[in-house]
A protein has these predicted regions:
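Intrinsically disordered, low-complexity regions enriched in serine/threonine
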Residues: 1-16, 97-103, 109-279
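Intrinsically disordered, low-complexity regulatory segments
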Residues: 1-54, 61, 65, 82, ...
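Amphipathic, interaction-prone secondary-structure segments
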Residues: 53-118, 268
């Protein structure tokens, strides 16, 4: 696996995020306060005249009319304040009828107006017991919409394309839950995750550390339990370990939109690949 990010980096080049999550649809006021870039009124000065500027709030309002509601939103903080209203932001949306539950499929909508991102939609999965927001791999499909032409209609079409793979996500989850992992396979999955996150030179924690569940529901021996445990430990951090110099540390939580998406997606692919190899 290739090295993804520096072991002790707080975030990617996009910096920390402002974020909000609720157990109900977010209000316009909450979005305005926490994620103002959704309401940006014009493209960044670095964008050309060919850039079709459609505020994310316009896209969101159209998605809401189609029955999709935001439950989580965040945007990256930037040092260059001129980009604050244009910076990358992410929404996690649920469809009417799939609002609550222990496991809820979601549409992940990414965008920015400073040239760092097109509209991007990915399938996701929310686990209520640990507030884990999973990102499913590219094998299940994702949609990119450039800032050109009829953006709103294409994003709405993309949302329905993502909804179309929700059943396949459920099927993958059921298959992972039914597959009992022998200890060597659990260790291999955890080692692949550590290598992706930290590289080969130094890993501040061990496979045993990231395979240690945070709640009794994850003490199963199946692939789904191992994947969930690794995902939560890697993203939430707080695990005691040692730096390359031997200093005692705690792993940091991931606050970067980019790193969250990349690591989350990679973990799904690892679990999915292991599932297929052991069937």
């Amino acid at each position: 696996m290739r090295r993804s990010v520096n072991a002790y980096q707080l975030a990617s080049r996009f910096g920390h995020v402002n974020q909000i999550r609720r157990e109900r649809p977010l209000t316009r006021e909450e979005l305005m306060y926490h994620v103002p870039s959704i309401f940006g009124e014009d493209r960044h000065t670095s964008r050309s005249e060919r850039y079709a500027y459609i505020p994310t709030i316009t896209v969101l309002e159209n998605l809401q009319r189609e029955g999709f509601q935001p439950f989580f939103a965040c945007q990256t903080r930037v040092r260059d304040q001129s980009r604050r209203g244009y910076t990358k932001h992410m929404l996690r949306l649920r469809r009417a009828g799939q609002i609550t539950g222990q496991h809820v499929p979601e549409i992940i909508l990414l965008n920015s107006h400073d040239g760092s991102s097109s509209y991007q939609m990915l399938p996701g999965y929310f686990r209520a017991i640990c507030t884990n927001g999973l990102v499913c791999g590219q094998s299940l499909g994702e949609v990119r919409v450039p800032h050109r032409g009829n953006v709103v209609d294409r994003v709405i079409e993309g949302a329905y394309e993502v909804v179309g793979v929700f059943d396949r996500i459920e099927e993958k989850r059921d298959a992972m839950q039914s597959l009992v992992l022998p200890p060597p396979a659990r260790q291999a999955l955890a080692q692949a995750a550590l290598t992706y996150r930290y590289g080969d030179e130094h890993q501040p924690v061990t496979t045993t550390d990231i395979l240690t569940p945070r709640r009794r529901e994850d003490y199963g021996k199946d692939l789904w339990s191992a994947y969930q445990t690794i995902q939560e430990n890697m993203l939430k951090g707080g695990i005691s370990g040692r730096s390359a110099r031997g200093k005692r540390i705690h792993t940091r939580a991931i606050h970067s939109i980019d790193t969250d998406i990349k690591l989350n997606r990679a973990l799904w692919v690892m679990a999915e690949t292991l599932l297929e190899s052991m069937r």
